[in-house]
């Protein structure tokens, strides 16, 4: 315990003592120096800090507001209306970065069109033993086996409730908040865990995510089976509908990329049958694509980043077809450019998310994706993002 406290104090000292350097790099963020971040700053930080310490530092810096507001102005063509809300732009931060709702406002400042917090479990839990995050810089990829490390519902609720009025205004301005729910490792009743999450955090969310696709909690992915999924989602929807007030969040399901054709058909069938509001496609993959170069490529866990990109996009394409384009999809997996985002949108995604790209390219990647996406939309004759959703299926 003493060693953990010492490490925490040391990391806090880095944050405080490094303030001058952080302010300098903040200036570079404001001026959009993508090259500096990708070629010098991010590799330098990775040499200094192990992946989990770097993650903690990033969350802390963002939560303190040390990074300036992005100056890029979202044009009307980037606006999307979906899930009962307006999204100023379609690029969000995926769950996993801000697991405990500590850095929401700082993330909006970077230019994200929406923020997803979590995964949050009912009770606090440590997650899996360290080390549990591994960089594959040669592949622009990460393997993680965090295992739903979480401060728990009570702490996250308190944190988000303190900014509830601020979030209400942000949502009205086109910057919604999503909350990703998980189950505790030792829980024997998954449905009860997710239901508790809905009751506790539902009133604070614009959308909720039922995460049944993390590969790092034993037995979790089995909840994607047709019978199990129907039971779980029926309970979740019942709890959502029972929430007091008129502000009831949309309910989405986050699925894995490692599914059989039958699995995908079953998920689509259950989603249509129960009236699920949306799908998040996809989580990390347990597969290891041929050609990975990173020395740590054989580590156990979920793989994210560039090697996941095409598998994720293909799964989006299939789920859009299986749901006849009637269930909105948030596409995630390997997005680091406007081209990546547009490919997912044309495959059927209404919105996209990124996370791993931040690790290797830094905060400027958010504006880069939006700027490139806008240029590509114009180049290909689309007047809005909405016009491009599912365009591949209309050819």
Swiss-Prot record:
Its cofactor is FMN. Its main location: mitochondrion. It is found in: Mitochondrion inner membrane. Residues 1-10 form a transit peptide. One of its GO terms (cellular component) is mitochondrial inner membrane. Monomer. Belongs to the dihydroorotate dehydrogenase family. Type 2 subfamily. This is Dihydroorotate dehydrogenase (quinone), mitochondrial. It comes from Rattus norvegicus. The gene is Dhodh.
């Amino acid at each position: 315990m003493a060693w953990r406290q010492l490490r925490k104090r040391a990391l806090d000292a880095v944050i405080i003592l490094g303030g001058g350097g952080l302010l300098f790099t903040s200036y570079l963020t404001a001026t959009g120096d993508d090259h500096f971040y990708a070629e010098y700053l991010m590799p330098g930080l990775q040499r200094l800090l192990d992946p989990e310490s770097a993650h903690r530092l990033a969350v802390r810096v963002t939560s303190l507001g040390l990074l300036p507001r992005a100056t890029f102005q979202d044009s009307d063509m980037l606006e999307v209306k979906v899930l009962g809300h307006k999204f100023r732009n379609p690029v969000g931060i995926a769950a996993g970065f801000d697991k405990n709702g500590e850095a929401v406002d700082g993330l909006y400042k970077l230019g994200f069109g929406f923020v997803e917090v979590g995964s949050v479990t009912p009770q606090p839990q440590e997650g899996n033993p360290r080390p549990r995050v591994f960089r594959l810089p040669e592949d622009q990829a990460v393997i993680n086996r965090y295992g739903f490390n979480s401060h728990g519902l009570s702490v996250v609720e308190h944190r988000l409730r303190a900014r509830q009025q601020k979030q209400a205004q942000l949502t009205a301005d086109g910057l919604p908040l999503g909350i990703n729910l998980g189950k505790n490792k030792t829980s024997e009743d998954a449905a009860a865990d997710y239901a508790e999450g809905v009751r506790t955090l539902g009133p604070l969310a614009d959308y909720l995510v039922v995460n049944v696709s993390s590969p790092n909690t034993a037995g979790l992915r089995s909840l994607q089976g047709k019978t199990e999924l129907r039971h779980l989602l029926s309970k979740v929807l019942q709890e959502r509908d029972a929430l007091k007030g008129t502000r009831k969040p949309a309910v989405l399901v986050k699925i894995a990329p490692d599914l059989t054709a039958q699995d995908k058909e079953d998920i689509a069938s259950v989603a249509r049958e129960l009236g699920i509001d949306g799908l998040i496609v996809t989580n990390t993959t347990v597969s290891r694509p041929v050609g990975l170069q990173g020395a740590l490529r054989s580590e156990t866990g979920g793989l994210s980043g560039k090697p996941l990109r095409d598998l994720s996009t293909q799964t989006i394409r299939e789920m859009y077809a299986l749901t006849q384009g009637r269930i909105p999809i948030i596409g995630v997996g390997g997005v680091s450019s406007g081209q990546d985002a547009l490919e997912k949108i044309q495959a059927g995604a209404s919105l996209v998310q990124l996370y791993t790209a931040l690790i290797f390219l830094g905060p400027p990647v958010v504006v880069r994706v939006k700027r490139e996406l806008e240029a590509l939309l114009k180049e290909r004759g689309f007047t809005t993002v909405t016009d491009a959703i599912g365009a591949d299926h209309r050819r």
